[in-house]
Amino acid sequence: MSPAKVDVTKKSDAKAQALKTAKAVKSGTTKFKKVKKIRTSVTFHRPRTLTKDRNPKYPRISATPRNKLDQYQILKYPLTTESAMKKIEDNNTLVFIVDIRANKKKIKDAVKKMYDIQTKKVNTLIRPDGTKKAYVRLTPDYDALDVANKIGII
């Protein structure tokens, strides 16, 4: 007799539990009610997450890369054509063939390091043969003829 009685109490407990749960669901007193976020845009923007600082166990590159464009690499050679000589005499300008990757600022710095002269401005152009030509205009306190003589152009 006792096993039948136990089954009845289990059933009534289960039924009571189900009724309790149904009542809780209907009334809406659940703990984890998810709130719907209203989307105002069609596109989804990924939220910014935590980014930790890199702390590598060992360096991935063993040696630091050397500077491939130093002043000796930038200035290849001075031009000694008739038109370049005319520029030296008339416009206080030196003419150089320079590396194709060098920009005006790098050319200016290279001329300053190599020949200890101040430049007023630098004009560049790419020649049809693919090399870069630089017209380096010197400041009035330097004479291009003297500098050209010191370099060995004249």
UniProtKB/Swiss-Prot annotation:
Asked whether the keyword rRNA-binding is assigned, the reply is yes
Biological process terms from the Gene Ontology for this record are: translation
**Gene3D superfamilies in the record:** 3.30.70.330
Keyword annotations: Ribonucleoprotein, Ribosomal protein, RNA-binding, rRNA-binding
GO cellular component term, pick one: ribonucleoprotein complex
Superkingdom of the source? Eukaryota
Q: Which Pfam families match?
A: Ribosomal_L23 (PF00276), Ribosomal_L23eN (PF03939)
Know the name of this protein? Large ribosomal subunit protein uL23
Question: Which species expresses this protein natively?
Answer: Daucus carota
Encoding gene (name): RPL23A
